[in-house]
Amino acid sequence: MSEQEIWEKVLTLAQEKVSSASYQTFLKDTKLFKLQNEQAIVVTDDDFVANWLKMNYAEIIKAALYEAIGHEIAPVFYTEEELKSLHTSEQKEENQPEQPAKKYTPGVDEAVIGGEQFNTHNTFETFVIGPGNRFPHAASLAVAEAPAKAYNPLFIYGGVGLGKTHLMHAIGHYVLDNNPDAKVIYTSSEKFTNEFIKSIRDNKTERFREKYRNIDVLLIDDIQFIQNKEQTQEEFFHTFNELHQANKQIVISSDRPPKEIAKLEDRLRSRFEWGLIVDITPPDYETRMAILQKKIGEENLNIPTEALTYIANQIQSNIRELEGALTRVLAFSKLQGQPITTELTAEALKDIIQAPKSKKITIQDIQKIVGQYYSVRIEDFSAKKRTKSIAYPRQIAMYLSRELTDFSLPKIGEEFGGRDHTTVIHAHEKIVKDIQNDPTFKQEVENLEKEIRNQ
C-alpha cells in the first residue's frame, strides 16, 4: 500500500470519529509525507491546524494508523514550511565536503536522536520563565552549555504539563546546535523498559547496551515508571554508572522527587540525588498570561487581552491545559466564523471549565460513583476478582481516574489493589477503544463523568 493509500484509509477511519465540520476544517487537507523511524510525518496547512491535531486528534489518528498498517506508529505534525526548512538543512549537510568515515558503533548510530526528532517548538527561546520554573530553567541551560560539568545528574520533577519535557528537548536542541556530532538520546523510561525486554527476547542485550552507554547525553523522561521493575532498574543502574563514570551528562524527569518514588532501589535513589534536584510548580497568573501572549505572538494572531485574561484566570493547573484551551478557543472561533470575544471564549471553554469545585476529585470519589452505577462494592475495585461484572467497571474507574485526576499511573494502580501501571494503561486504552466503537457506551461514560464532576 502506498503512503497516499494509507492516508486515504486513515482519513476514512478518522472521519467516522469526528464531526463533519471538524473533519473539513482540520483533517481533509492533511497529507502523509512519509513513514519514518516509527513515526508518521503528517503535513498540515499551518501551525494552528498542526497544534489542534496534536492536542485533540493524535490518539484518533494513531488508532487509525494502527488499523491501516497493522502496527503502532506515532503521528507527528509539520507545516509545509517546517518540512522545507528541514529539507534545506538536509541538503546543506549533503553538500558539505566529504568527511572521513566515522567508526560505526552497532546499535548507536541508527538510534541516536537528531534534532529533527525533538519537538521543534521546545527550545530555551520559547520557554516562558516564571517563579515556578526559573530555577529548573537555569539549571537546564547550565547543563546544556556545559554537559557533565555543571550538574550531573540533573533531576527535574513536577506535575503533568508543567514543562519538564520542554526543558529536556531544549537541552537536546542546544547540545546538538553547538555540537552536531554529539550523541544525544531522549527517551521515556517506559520505552527504555520495552526496548530492554525486546533485547532480551531477541538475544541482543549487548546491542541495547551499546546504544545507551556509548552516548554523550541521556535524557530520560518519567523515570517513576521503572519502579517495581527489578531487571530494568538493574540495567539502568549499570547504564547510569557507565555514563557517569565516563563523564557523560544524564538528565532525568519524574512526577515526584526520588525519595517519593516507591519501590525504587536505594542505590538508584541515591544516584539520582548525587547531582541537582529541581522542581517545577504550576505557573502563576503573570506567567500564564505571558505564555498565552507568546503563543499568539509566535502564530501572529490577534486576540483581545480580555479573552486571554479569561483563559489565564480559568485554566490554572498546567501549561498543557492552558495552551489546549487557547487552541480550543481559536478552533471554536474558526468553526463559528466569529471574532474572538470574552463571551465566545467562555462559550468555547464551558465544557472544560467546571463550576467552582467544592473539592478535588479523588480516586475514591470515582470508585464510589462507578461502583453505585454498576453495583460493585468499593472493596471489589481493589480485589483480585476478574469476573467481567467487576473487571470491566474496574477498567472504567481506572480510565476515569486517569482522565479526571492528576494522579500518576503508579498511584492509580496502587489505589486499585496495587496493580501495575501497565494494567492502568491497558484499561485506559481498552475503554478509549470501546468509547470510539460504541456511541451508547460513550454516552454512559460521559454521564459518569458529569456525575463525578458535579458531586
Curated annotation (Swiss-Prot):
ATP binds at G161, G163, K164, T165. GO terms for molecular function: ATP binding; ATP hydrolysis activity; DNA replication origin binding; lipid binding. Residues 74-116 are annotated as: Domain II. Transmembrane segments: none annotated. Residues 117-333 are annotated as: Domain III, AAA+ region. Residues 334-455 are annotated as: Domain IV, binds dsDNA. It is found in: Cytoplasm. PROSITE patterns: DNAA. Keywords: ATP-binding, Cytoplasm, DNA replication, DNA-binding, Lipid-binding, Nucleotide-binding. The keyword Transport does not apply. GO terms for biological process: DNA replication initiation; regulation of DNA replication. Residues 1-74 are annotated as: Domain I, interacts with DnaA modulators. Its main location: cytoplasm. Signal peptide: none annotated. One of its GO terms (cellular component) is cytoplasm. Residues 85-104 are annotated as: Disordered. NCBIfam families: DnaA, PRK14086.1. Domain I is involved in oligomerization and binding regulators, domain II is flexibile and of varying length in different bacteria, domain III forms the AAA+ region, while domain IV binds dsDNA. PANTHER family: CHROMOSOMAL REPLICATION INITIATOR PROTEIN DNAA. Plays an essential role in the initiation and regulation of chromosomal replication. ATP-DnaA binds to the origin of replication (oriC) to initiate formation of the DNA replication initiation complex once per cell cycle. Binds the DnaA box (a 9 base pair repeat at the origin) and separates the double-stranded (ds)DNA. Forms a right-handed helical filament on oriC DNA; dsDNA binds to the exterior of the filament while single-stranded (ss)DNA is stabiized in the filament's interior. Oligomerizes as a right-handed, spiral filament on DNA at oriC. Belongs to the DnaA family. This is Chromosomal replication initiator protein DnaA. It comes from Staphylococcus saprophyticus subsp. saprophyticus (strain ATCC 15305 / DSM 20229 / NCIMB 8711 / NCTC 7292 / S-41). The lineage of its organism: Bacteria, Bacillati, Bacillota, Bacilli, Bacillales. The gene is dnaA.
